A protein has these predicted regions:
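Juxtamembrane helix-entry segments on the extracytoplasmic side of multipass membrane proteins
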Residues: 1-13, 65-79
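Residue-level hotspots within the lipid-embedded alpha helices of multi-pass solute transporters
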Residues: 16-21, 53, 77-82
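Membrane-interface helix/loop boundary segments of multi-pass membrane proteins
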Residues: 22-49, 64, 93-98
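Functionally important transmembrane alpha-helices
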Residues: 46, 70-130
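Membrane-interface helix-cap regions at the ends of transmembrane helices
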Residues: 53-66
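Hydrophobic core of alpha-helical transmembrane segments in multi-pass integral membrane proteins
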Residues: 126-144
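Membrane-interface capping segments at transmembrane-helix boundaries
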Residues: 138-156
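Short, intrinsically disordered terminal tails adjacent to the first/last structured region
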Residues: 151-168
Length: 168
């Protein structure tokens, strides 16, 4: 990102749209729907994390903050990527499959955490908030899945809509 000031103010919107939105066309627009055909949202997020984190490995060789931290950042990096993948899967599913929504979220995250003025504190706080958000997203979803299993076959759905085989 250190090259952005040299490109001028007009480069920022282009970077903003391509940095997050460009990636999300592949990760959430292409891969996620295919993974979710056979896996839960959480498992799909975990599988997507492997590819997504691998895609970002080159940053360890050119981003100054990554270079100074060395290999000790890798476990936290993968945990953060999993949290991010979980949040983006949730957002993608909640938005009806909007790649634009996840792309803008991703680009905003990149802007806050990767800008030269962000510093380590902004990146750390933002990443921590994403991890907390991931836990908040996953916990109720897993609990709802257990509750819905208790009601299976009764005709009562958590959505409030009638289910096949019974009425609300």
């Amino acid at each position: 990102m250190n090259f952005l000031p040299d490109l001028g103010l007009l480069a920022w919107p282009l970077w903003f749209l391509t940095s997050g939105c460009g990636e999300e066309l592949g990760w959430r627009g292409f891969a996620l729907p295919r993974l979710q055909r056979t896996h839960s949202a959480l498992v799909s997020s975990a599988l997507l994390t492997i590819g997504w984190a691998s895609w970002h490995v080159p940053m360890f060789f050119y981003v100054p903050s990554y270079l100074t931290l060395g290999l000790r950042i890798v476990p936290g990096f993968f945990l953060g990527m999993f949290a991010g993948a979980t949040v983006l899967t949730w957002l993608y599913n909640r938005s009806g499959g909007s790649v634009l929504a996840v792309g803008l979220w991703h680009a905003s995250f990149n802007f806050v955490t990767a800008s030269p003025n962000a510093g380590g504190l902004a990146a750390a706080v933002t990443s921590t908030l994403v991890m907390v958000w991931a836990v908040i997203v996953v916990w109720p979803t897993r609990r709802a899945r257990r509750i819905s299993a208790d009601y299976r076959g009764t005709g009562v759905a958590l959505t409030g809509a009638p289910t096949q085989g019974g009425s609300r």
